[in-house]
């Protein structure tokens, strides 16, 4: 082939290009060969350049297995429309030799691989840009935190000029001061809510504990109450009432006064039933007159002057001593004498008769 001019340069070309150049140079049609038996006489002798659509080596099972194992073919799905265009162009080059098709597929696989690599690099760059755009956490110094907390205790909400002034003092931006105050207010509210919840839990716990203790001590209380009810004093209800918040001091004093009046009341019912005209002055006058008359002294002395007591003596009517009870002589005068106890009108008349008789001589 070296004797043919221009054929040496064709060795580096593809077989299809070399064949076309050779035909154009010799001016011979594809149906005959000018070189005799040394070269191929017809196109049909180029068996390697037969129609690739009928071969099962590329489109059959073996080809599908090779395609599944080839990483370049798996990346072709990322090409999208480019892969569809390449597949459509394959039908146009159906008469092209198999080596050309293999080169085209290799080029398509490399292109798809490069496109996928570019997409991954682009996604990584976007992620890096997003991470760079995210603001870093700012760490405050101890002096800045101290100044912020001191101002927060004085004022929980700051206006825009106040934030700007405070930010200039501690070398921060007004936005940083604003965010710090917002976070600190939220923390304070949350801590306050947690504290209230803990207090409620403690109260409920103590309440339940007291209820349980009362239930455990209730049998002992019933036994103690049953034993102490027999030895209870009148002052215990008052003490219990004081514990319940009631005041019975005035009521107790009134009861005490009534008891004292009842104790001071005389045992004899004479002063409660004598008429109004039998007063102290009248009784003193009658006593002075009765001392001069032995009959009045013996008969009426015990009723008019009950405080004077003496032992009765046996004998006639005149032998009754002063201060003798009228009950002892009630049967002598009238069966109703002891019932009326000197309140009967006949007894009042008889007493006046005896008093008038004191001035007359007695037979």
UniProtKB/Swiss-Prot annotation:
Lineage summary: Eukaryota, Metazoa, Spiralia, Lophotrochozoa, Platyhelminthes
GO molecular function term, any single one: RNA polymerase II cis-regulatory region sequence-specific DNA binding
Composition bias type Polar residues, residue spans: 220-231
Top-level taxonomic group: Eukaryota
Protein name: Homeobox protein DTH-2
Key words, A-Z: Developmental protein, DNA-binding, Homeobox, Nucleus
Biased composition (Basic and acidic residues): 191-219, 232-246
Tissue expr: Intestine and unidentified peripheral parenchymal cells. Slightly higher levels in the cephalic region compared to other body regions.
Residues within the DNA-binding region(s): 133-192
GO cellular component, one term: nucleus
GO biological process: cell differentiation
Homology family: Belongs to the NK-2 homeobox family.
Region Disordered, residue ranges: 189-246
